[in-house]
Amino acid sequence: MSVSQSPESESQSPNPAGDESGQINRPTKAETLRRRAAYAFGNLGQSAFYNALSTYFVVYVTSVLFVNVEKALATKLIALITSLIVIIRIAEIFLDPLLGNLVDNTNTRFGRFRPWQFIGGLVSAVLLVMVYTGLFGLVNVNQTWFIVLFVVVFIVLDVFYSMRDISYWGMIPAISSDSHERSVYTALGTFTGSIGYNGITIVVVPIVTTFSFMFTGSRAESQSGWTAFGIITALLGILTAWTVAFGTKENESVLRSRADQSGK
């Protein structure tokens, strides 16, 4: 239903179309489907990445990472690494609101959220490969330096993954002002996220054993097999994050603009 406006009110309105959401041009059906597909694909890799970063990284640490280290020392290092991961996860509870505020206050010509898909996807992927290589073999050279650098790398990795995750779910209101369309994006992201998270569980053993056999001649899991797993997951992470970054479009709204102005 259209509402007539006086010429004076029309001149004062920042949106000539009279849409309170601030969206002037509606996307075509093809554009909508493309953006939905791009957004949905994003959480496929994001959830797979998270499973590799949490569940399977611990498996890698406890089974392969310290295989060339003296057994007694390896046991201590495993306990130390797993404890550090738990501490970092707890700290993340308090850090996430700050990261969310940083994302929401980002202002670029590409939008608030898409830049973090690009940056977060790239940085977290590179660092995931690093931790799945034992920091490029440093674990077998100097365990003290390995622990120090591991803490730094894992914290940065976790931060940039969180930036990607926060921006992914936070961008839904910026993609569409329509409540039904938002629910579609949420449902698609949840659905593909389930596929990605559980899918990595299906492929992890074949990937690790196949690449272990290629490089060692044995089907037993090895460093090379887990490194290959890390690289494949990282590539999937970059591909899906960049698909969101380049395949979606943020729409600035009048309400958000007013909120920004009131916050200044």
Question: What are the residue ranges of the model-derived segments?
Answer:
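Membrane-embedded alpha-helical bundles of multi-pass transporters/translocases
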Residues: S2-K264
